[in-house]
């Protein structure tokens, strides 16, 4: 199976002047790529656009921090869906060592407003620790499905699942956490974190997530599930994107966002890489649709 290859132009977003850009969420609309991301120097969520997924326009802030709320001294780690004529954003608000998930809306996809004063998801269980963060939301047959990370504020520990009929009032799964680290896998022996999930016709629900070898070393991994909640199978090819020694992502590869490009027959994946305190956005591709062929071969005894 073809491997994921880092683009030679990396990083594709972020610089000393722009500052740290991280935890991206990429979608495609009207033939263009839309990247929602966290802009650390601005303590805000921002958006940028591209025709090829490599060269990006000047970012625009979509939602700023709101210290007056008591839970949004800093905001980041968002995802945005367009449903009908409304852009819907779920994002992470942080204050006093805690993280929460908030909600905002927009009619133009740039200027978002908060219809609510309170977060839509908070930490309630011991395993959720101090934080719920990194929302990834899909809308299927009238149901909003959210995968989120929970645990410590600096880096979360597990992944969980919730559902909603309106995107605001959420019911957490009774089997949470739905995805945890397996200590025998060195690449995730410390914890797992921020993910993106998509539904496919041929592989079920596919998840790309962060596996932490330790609190400072992270890499990108993948898994699949028939229902997005249970029977997760982690790829024997993990990790699929690793730090490159001596490079801009030498210490960690975080929070993937990925999509299938039917026209070019390839997977496209964006992530934020770190070297020391700098975090910028990188781009990788994989030719061909196959992601889990090696798993299928093993299960068939081949």
For each of these PLM feature ranges, what is it?
Residues 1-302:
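Carbohydrate-active catalytic/glycan-binding domains of CAZyme proteins
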